Amino acid sequence: MPNHQNMLDNQTILITGGTGSFGKCFVRKVLDTTNAKKIIVYSRDELKQSEMAMEFNDPRMRFFIGDVRDLERLNYALEGVDICIHAAALKHVPIAEYNPLECIKTNIMGASNVINACLKNAISQVIALSTDKAANPINLYGATKLCSDKLFVSANNFKGSSQTQFSVVRYGNVVGSRGSVVPFFKKLVQNKASEIPITDIRMTRFWITLDEGVSFVLKSLKRMHGGEIFVPKIPSMKMTDLAKALAPNTPTKIIGIRPGEKLHEVMIPKDESHLALEFEDFFIIQPTISFQTPKDYTLTKLHEKGQKVAPDFEYSSHNNNQWLEPDDLLKLL
């Protein structure tokens, strides 16, 4: 089976939200390790696109100013594209709670627009990025991403004559991504803050590096049948240990859980254990619906064999068997 380098050779790839942390890392990896024909960055911010164009300076890159809320613009941008990575989202949990309709327009209606445009343009493969907050959601952001996941999974059933395959990749917090807690804590340290705010001493989170996230998406392109949700096996970390790693000499202050926050995140809920398959370094959540063409998710397209998990299995950040200590996080940074 070809590796992702060969698989992307001579392919045109479009990434929505391509100027974000994931998008920039994804584009860099594809440019550096493949002979992709063209990479199209589709996003709203002209300044970020201008800065990215100067930073990367590669003739294979194209930039489209556009919003995923704009179906007509997406249809135009996706002409001649082979692979679409959907990374655009409004993802800030408290802001989504205060601006729910805006979050719904981008994360749900935007997802629907991406699906429709990909079907119209007969895109070969589509992967949508999801989040651990989509499992058992208690906040609006997580609920919109759950809706998005359902839309992408079900798209495999109404594709008609198109051969488009839609899959989802779900993972946890990305170490150092824009707007995340790591740069926030770092800035507090730089500004010589007298204390580091912690919402709850029990809080845990899943963690993955940007490079690991990008590699997992590229590997999922090789593995996918369409309709599955890919979940990597990644470590957890206590938020108190995160504070110790980044600010070992600064006291912490418990400020209480923010709107929409959970104590622990879940990537595979117990109620979905009957759908989960375990592989060496990842899981697959099989779709709840059946498709016109049956798919055997126990065997990936890389011929990796999966096994059913235990009936009461739950993949949560607090019952994980992989843990990051403060020194481990510093190595990742």
UniProtKB/Swiss-Prot annotation:
What InterPro entries does the record point to? Answer: NAD(P)-bd_dom_sf, Polysac_CapD-like, Polysaccharide_Synthase-Rel, PseB
Keywords assigned: Lyase, NADP, Nucleotide-binding
The enzyme's first-digit EC class, named in words, is lyase
Which residues bind substrate per the record?
A: K91, N173, V181, T199, R258, E261
Q: What is the effect of changing K133 to A/E?
A: Loss of activity
Q: How does it assemble?
A: Homohexamer.
Kindly provide the name given to this protein in its UniProt entry.
UDP-N-acetylglucosamine 4,6-dehydratase (inverting)
Q: What is the lineage of its organism?
A: Bacteria, Pseudomonadati, Campylobacterota, Epsilonproteobacteria, Campylobacterales
Instruction: Please state the gene responsible for encoding this protein.
Output: pseB
